Amino acid sequence: MATTDFIAAIELSSSKISGIAGKKNSDGSIQVLAYAREDASSFIHKGVIYNIDKTAQALTSITNKLENQLNNSIAKVYVGIGGQSLRTVKNAVSRTLDEEGIISQELVDSICDENLEVPLADMSILDVAPQEYKIDNTLQADPVGVAGQHIIGQFLNIVARASLKKNLEHSFEQAKVEIADLLIAPIALANAVLTENEMRSGCALVDFGADTTTISVYKNNILRYLSVLPLGGNTITRDITSLQMEEQDAEKLKLQYG
């Protein structure tokens, strides 16, 4: 019997490309309906796609496997984006009103739009995490409706090299797989594993991958910092091989003794 009520997602990493399809139950839990993966170590390094043709082939294979398990076609997939060069950059935009007035939604929208125009050389803004707004030296989480004459919007822009997103989109286009939406992988992970109390009280989430380690910091339910370090599990394996050990044995030793 064909499965019709589902959502599909694909995440690309240095070691593998994973695809999953599932549905949300009435109690809020997620039921996994299909799963597939392909090795990506030969064409994705530090989370960055270096061979679009091979990536497209892997995406096609994963999509076909998911469709076979679902006995249905997949129209669109949600895609997690991460990898080296992904990081956060702070920015502030200020406005001064002619006289004290009420901060409107239109003014806030205009400040948000101006933030997106900040020059970033070869980087592009993938998403924005608004921090706070300062109105006449008083911090406000929601400035709309507050009286004041001077407003500063503080933003945390999530940026990456333009090629990171471009190569990913080219790979999906070549595989003829339509992207429903691009999700920042570390943020999606944080939303899945961190509790509201942890995000509010303040915590750091460290995701240790094959070629990279991603650090995300939260405070007051807001992302405060994100960075991807070009070091991962494979780095440890390579260090062990320097002791005149084969890579396969080094990997086994690492996994066995941590």
Question: Where on the chain are the PLM-derived regions?
Answer:
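Nucleotide/phosphate-binding catalytic cleft detector across ATP-hydrolyzing
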Residues: 1-16, 20-204, 222-224, 233, ...
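Glycine-rich phosphate-binding loop of actin/hexokinase-like ATP-binding domains
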Residues: 201-242
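A short helix-loop
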Residues: 208, 216, 248-256
